[in-house]
C-alpha cells in the first residue's frame, strides 16, 4: 500500500441475502485512532487515490489536488491552488457513445447536446499541470455551478480531491452535508491507483459484451 495501512485498508463484508453486514471499522477498528496509519508516507499532489467516503463508507477514486494547508478554489472553470492558477492547455476533443454505463446505468452528459442514444457525445479535453509538475487530462462540458467556488482551506491531516471529469464529478468541491465528498481524512485513504485491470460499461461484470478491453491493464495517468 503506497500510503501505509489504516482501518480503511480492511474490506467491508456485505451479503444482504444472509444478513451479513460487517463494516471495515469492525474488522480493523483498532487502527482508527487519531488518524493513525501504519508504515505510512504522505501522498503526492496529482496522485489518483482510492479512498473511503467519510460519511457513506463507499469507495471513491479521485485525483488528489489539495494537500493539508492548501487553499483550493475554482474560478471560471480553472483550478487555483494557493491563489495561483494551474497550467492549462488544449487537449482536443474526447468522444464516447451516448449510452447507459456502469451498475448505476448513468448516461454521459455531452457538450454537443442534444445527442440521441447511440450518438457521439463530445467533451472538451484539456491538459492540466499541477504545481509539482504532474500533468493530466481533464474533461469539460461547458459552464457549470462548480466552475466557481469559494476558497477551501484544507485542514491538517486531510486532503482535497477532484474528478478529472470535472463537470460530472461528485468530489471535494461539495460539502459532505450537501452529498459531496468534502475534506477526506488521511485515515480514509485506501491506496494509490496505478493500473486499470478491468473495465466494463455494463451493470454486471458477467455481461462480457460490455467489457472495454481497450482499457484492460492500462496505467492510470
Cite the ranges covered by each PLM segment.
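Soluble "head" domains of membrane/secretory-pathway proteins
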Residues: 1-221
Amino acid at each position: 500500500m503506497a500510503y501505509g495501512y489504516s482501518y480503511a485498508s480492511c474490506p467491508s463484508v456485505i451479503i444482504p441475502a444472509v444478513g451479513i453486514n460487517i463494516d471495515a471499522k469492525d474488522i480493523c477498528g483498532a487502527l482508527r485512532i487519531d488518524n493513525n496509519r501504519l508504515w505510512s508516507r504522505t501522498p503526492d499532489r496529482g496522485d489518483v487515490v482510492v479512498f473511503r467516503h467519510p460519511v457513506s463508507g463507499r469507495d471513491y477514486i479521485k485525483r488528489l489536488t489539495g494537500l493539508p494547508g492548501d487553499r483550493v478554489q475554482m474560478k471560471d472553470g480553472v483550478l487555483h491552488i494557493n491563489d495561483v492558477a494551474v497550467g492549462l492547455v488544449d487537449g482536443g476533443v474526447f468522444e464516447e457513445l451516448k449510452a447507459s454505463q456502469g451498475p448505476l446505468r448513468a448516461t454521459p452528459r455531452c457538450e454537443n447536446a442534444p445527442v440521441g442514444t447511440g450518438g457521439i457525445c463530445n467533451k472538451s479535453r484539456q491538459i492540466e499541470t499541477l504545481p509539482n509538475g504532474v500533468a493530466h487530462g481533464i474533461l469539460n462540458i461547458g459552464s457549470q455551478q462548480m466552475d466557481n467556488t469559494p476558497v477551501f482551506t484544507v485542514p491538517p491531516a486531510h486532503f482535497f480531491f477532484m474528478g478529472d471529469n470535472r463537470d460530472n464529478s461528485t468530489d471535494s468541491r461539495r460539502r459532505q452535508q450537501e452529498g459531496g465528498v468534502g475534506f477526506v481524512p488521511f485515515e480514509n485513504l485506501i491506496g494509490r491507483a496505478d493500473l486499470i485491470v478491468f473495465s466494463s460499461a455494463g451493470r454486471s461484470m458477467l455481461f462480457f459484451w460490455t467489457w472495454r478491453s481497450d482499457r484492460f491493464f492500462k496505467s492510470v495517468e
